[in-house]
Amino acid sequence: MLVIASVVLAMILWGITFVVFKYANLSFDPIAIVFIRLFISVPFLFGFALISGRMMKIRKGDFKYFFIMAFFEPFIYFLGEAFGLSMVSSTMGAVIIAIIPLLVPVAAYFLIKERLSVMNIIGLIISFGGVLMVIMASEGQFSGNAKGILLMFIAVLAAVGYTIMAKKLVHTYNGIIITAWQSTLGALLFLPLFMIFEFREVLHLTVQPESWYAVLYLGIFGSGVCFILFTAGIRELGASKANVYANLVPVVTAIVSYFMLDEA
């Protein structure tokens, strides 16, 4: 029961991140948002691991798995999500992201030979239909934000890759260490992009207070607490079952965005 509560809390906090991103985007561009949130999350995560006595040494042979996982998420995932959310509404972004739990069993079937049920296939078809309805209803026509929608789907595929790769590590390492190294490697991957494209601009920015609060939330909760809770869920429930709760994300986002962003 505690594990389920942890996963549900992770999804609630994640749902809020789609709205909070919009406040961060008032001052920062997408790459800066992602790099700064990861930069904040790394000391938070390693500090928490040290204080809680959960610090673990990574075996040399496992670094390649950590790197591949970090390449999928946060690197590719956040590139897709951050730029995608700058082009589509918070609610639409969350609805697209919500198809992740339905794609994970399909990917697991082909990549790690997990059983795929008929219900998984039916759910995937229904989910894609629902996403299409939201896109048409929100934008008037599919092509209205085609680039943003495509970027969100790239984020979805990256999250699926991350979830499959995480299955290799969750039974060896605790969620805090996995998330800490994931954020560290992700920050290193984003560092060249940040230095080349946005470092000088950030130095001369007049940042609105709400943007700093938003980036702090994204770093501590979005890239820290959420991943710790979710990784624990994968460990106890399995990838497919843990991802089922992702259906809560668009619901939370829709409610919060209605009150905070006035999105219908």
Task: Give residue ranges: language-model regions.
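Glycine-/small-residue-enriched transmembrane alpha-helix faces in small-molecule transporters
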Residues: M1-F35, F142-K168, L188-P192
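C-terminal-most transmembrane helix of multi-pass membrane proteins
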Residues: A5, V34-F39, F46, L50, ...
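Helix-helix packing/entry segments at the starts of transmembrane helices
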Residues: M11, V34-I36, F78, M92-I99, ...
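Specific transmembrane alpha-helical segments of multi-pass solute transporters/efflux pumps
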Residues: L13, T17-F18, F46-I97, M133, ...
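Membrane-interface helix termini and inter-helical loops of multi-pass transporters
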Residues: V19-P30, L85-M87, I135-N145, I196-E210, ...
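Transmembrane alpha-helices of multi-pass small-molecule transport proteins
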Residues: S27-I76, L103-A107, A158-M165, T179-E198, ...
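Hydrophobic transmembrane alpha-helices of multi-pass small-molecule transport proteins
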Residues: L45, F67, L116-S138, F190, ...
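C-terminal transmembrane-helix exit sites in multi-pass transporters
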Residues: G47-G53, I100-I125, V251-A264
